[in-house]
């Protein structure tokens, strides 16, 4: 059973893409999930599961080698937001797409980065700690950067986004860490259940993002019309994220496994969180404002998967857990 669960979890990126395909061709499957607060609850559950995987010891790496963790956080919140803003301007994206694209670029790293780091034999402990740190920093940085960079397109309610991030990220993660601290035996018995639940929840959110865009008048035609430009934008964004993240680590003289981890944390974004924030804070621009998260999720999975495979082939097997 554990092998089956591990197989299911390791194919997380594939299930997300499958959900997009189902949502595009059979939107009724996910349409109900796009209504009300289902997406918010689903992302909160994902963040709760992330919190359950963390304990206070998870942050000990900060005290062992804090500079590399700080560098990963700086890379996350400079390379991606600025790249997203510049790409949106350079490609002349319509305002709804530009705002959605910038939200993706301003979000913290996603847990999928840990999977890419694991497969690619990057420094896994740095990846896990950096994902947690960027998620916590995102409580402030995501609303602030979205306000600064997307405010030229549409009015941005930074306080509203802050409330959303606190609700979706801070409270569930804090609750998860508390449960892990208070009831470690229970969390240990859960095994891989948290990762399985997270995979299902993120896949449901992915399908629920595209479904309402498809059923609107001319929805499929609009998505197809956006496809070429959005695939280009997403490829540039995540390609720059991986490339500049790796280069930044090299410039500061870090070993290859640390550079790979920084690249993963910079290049992979939390697309599910971006889609939910877009839905909650820009309802008048839905569902188009949620469309960029679809293309970004597909391209970051594709680029990350190719890099992980290449890194795995070219990297001797060794312990990649310690920072």
How would you label these PLM feature ranges?
Residues 1-323:
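Alpha-helical transmembrane segments of multi-pass small-molecule/ion transporters
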């Amino acid at each position: 059973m554990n092998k089956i669960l591990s197989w299911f979890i390791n194919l997380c990126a594939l299930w997300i893409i499958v959900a997009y395909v189902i949502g595009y061709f059979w939107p009724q499957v996910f349409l109900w999930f796009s209504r009300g607060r289902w997406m918010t609850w689903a992302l909160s559950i994902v963040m709760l599961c992330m919190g359950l995987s963390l304990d206070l010891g998870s942050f000990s790496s900060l005290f062992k080698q804090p500079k590399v963790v700080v560098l990963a956080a700086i890379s996350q919140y400079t390379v991606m937001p600025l790249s997203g803003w510049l790409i949106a301007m350079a490609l002349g994206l319509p305002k709804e797409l530009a705002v959605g694209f910038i939200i993706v670029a301003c979000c913290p790293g996603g847990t999928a980065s840990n999977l890419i780091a694991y497969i690619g034999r990057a420094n896994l402990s740095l990846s896990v700690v950096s994902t947690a740190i960027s998620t916590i920093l995102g409580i402030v940085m995501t609303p602030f950067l979205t306000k600064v960079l997307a405010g030229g397109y549409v009015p941005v309610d930074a306080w509203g986004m802050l409330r959303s991030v606190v609700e979706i990220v801070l409270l569930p993660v804090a609750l998860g860490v508390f449960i892990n601290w208070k009831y470690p035996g229970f969390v240990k018995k859960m095994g891989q259940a948290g990762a399985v639940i997270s995979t299902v929840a993120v896949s449901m959110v992915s399908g629920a993002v595209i479904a309402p865009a498809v059923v609107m008048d001319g929805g499929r035609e609009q998505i197809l019309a956006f496809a070429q430009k959005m695939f280009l934008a997403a490829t540039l964004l995540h390609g720059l994220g991986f490339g500049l993240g790796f280069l930044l680590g090299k410039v500061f003289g870090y070993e290859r496994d640390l550079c790979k981890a920084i690249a993963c944390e910079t290049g992979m974004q939390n697309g599910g969180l971006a889609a939910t924030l877009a839905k909650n804070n820009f309802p008048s621009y839905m569902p188009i404002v949620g469309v960029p998260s679809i293309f970004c999720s597909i391209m970051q999975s594709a680029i990350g998967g190719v890099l992980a495979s290449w890194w795995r082939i070219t990297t001797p097997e060794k312990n990649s857990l310690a920072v």
